[in-house]
Amino acid sequence: AITYRSRPIFYSLQMPWENDWLNGPATEAACARILSLIGVQATAIRATEGGCCGWSVVVAIKKRAGEGKNAISALLSLPVVKQVIVTDDDIDIGNPDEVEWAVTFRCQADKDVVVLSGLKGKHVDPSVRPWDLKPGELPTTAKFGIDATIPEGIPAFRYERIVPAFADSVAPRDYL
């Protein structure tokens, strides 16, 4: 039978991918486990929504020398993780502005960005161009990590965030 509606709703969005939200805790648990195995003390781990709760991870650590990049290497070894940002534990990784601030002011791209090429990829990642692969061919990808921790040998106070006086008591909407 052919049916129709007099006032149909055309659903043109992609499905909500409930599995992405369900993957978040599992990804965070896998990250916690691998960091524990290499002796890095994570204080917070977040699989971000923008990275479909698995492809992109932000981690705050209690850092010792070399641990920022060690954490990046370990986390990028996880099959689905493609992008990692590691910060010190003074950064609220649930606040994208604080994470961006840490990347902007605690990172030098030539020293603190790690790029690994030729790693195993996933067919669902359009950046690996799965449509160009031959049947049975596995995709490879590049993954990267950003070490947004305070560099070793520099006092932490040099990297403290400066908050303008009275910033909490002023509401911009009062002046618009």
Residue ranges and their predicted role:
Residues 1-176:
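Charged, compositionally biased interaction regions
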